[in-house]
UniProtKB/Swiss-Prot annotation:
Primary localisation category: cytoplasm
Cited InterPro entries: NA-bd_OB-fold, RNA-binding_domain_S1_IF1, S1_domain, TIF_IF1
NCBIfam families hit by this protein: infA
Subunit details: Component of the 30S ribosomal translation pre-initiation complex which assembles on the 30S ribosome in the order IF-2 and IF-3, IF-1 and N-formylmethionyl-tRNA(fMet); mRNA recruitment can occur at any time during PIC assembly.
Boundaries of every S1-like domain copy: 1-72
Gene that this sequence comes from: infA
Pfam family, one: eIF-1a
The protein's name in its UniProt record: Translation initiation factor IF-1
Superkingdom to which the source organism belongs: Bacteria
Amino acid sequence: MAKEESIEVEGEILEALPNAQFRVKLENGLEVLAHVSGKIRMHYIRILPGDKVKVQISPYDLSKGRITYRYK
């Protein structure tokens, strides 16, 4: 079985939740629950409410995602 491609969308952090999770409002208006990717966690990149981020979303569950980039 081939792995489905993930969807990459930009969004804005609404609130920080426990366990390095965030509520993100995407540019299409949806809100998703997103966690921080390993590279961002490894390099201690701080993510705060109001930051613009890039989120990868699985096509299987459109309510959860992974934050892969924080825009400067």
